[in-house]
């Protein structure tokens, strides 16, 4: 077992770490954007089972669950294209759990998607419905 782990090429681990750093930088940019617009960040990288929502924020009577997709290349498509039916279902599941956990039933709920590619930044409010 130990030999299997050590046989993984170093560059794969390095690339995985680089992807995490790129993703975190994108999430930081979106969190800053939300804060500048008056949103309070409630959670970052909130997990429920093996599913995750990148940012949960609130403003007035709205709570938004934000999926952030950061790309350094469009080789595999734009970030928005990665928020498919399966990903939306996962986000909805986490949102339901979070609302129940925190007793936020009186809030209006919104699902936003942010896509970052190099210097371009696209933020879509109400990107999909529950």
Name each region found by the language model.
Residues 1-44:
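Acidic-basic catalytic patches of nuclease active cores, encompassing PD-(D/E)XK
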Residues 9, 70-119:
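Catalytic cores of nucleic-acid endonucleases
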Residues 46, 116, 128:
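Hydrophobic pocket-lining residues within nucleotide cofactor-binding pockets
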Residues 48-51:
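Short acidic/glycine-enriched loop/turn segments that link adjacent beta-strands
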Residues 53-76, 91:
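Conserved catalytic cores of phosphodiester-cleaving nucleases, focusing on short active-site segments
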Residues 63-65, 108, 121:
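Structural motif
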Residues 119-130:
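Short, low-complexity, polybasic intrinsically disordered segments
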């Amino acid at each position: 077992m130990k030999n299997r782990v050590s046989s993984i090429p170093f560059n794969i681990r390095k690339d995985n770490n680089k992807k995490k750093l790129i993703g975190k930088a994108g999430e930081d940019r979106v969190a800053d954007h939300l804060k500048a617009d008056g949103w309070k960040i409630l959670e970052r990288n909130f997990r429920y089972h093996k599913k995750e929502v990148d940012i949960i924020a609130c403003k007035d009577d709205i709570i938004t669950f934000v999926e952030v997709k950061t790309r350094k290349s469009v080789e595999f498509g734009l970030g928005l294209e990665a928020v498919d039916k399966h990903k939306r279902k996962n986000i909805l599941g986490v949102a339901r759990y979070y609302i129940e956990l925190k007793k936020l039933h009186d809030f209006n709920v919104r699902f936003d998607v942010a896509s970052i590619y190099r210097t371009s930044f696209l933020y879509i409010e109400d990107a999909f419905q529950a």
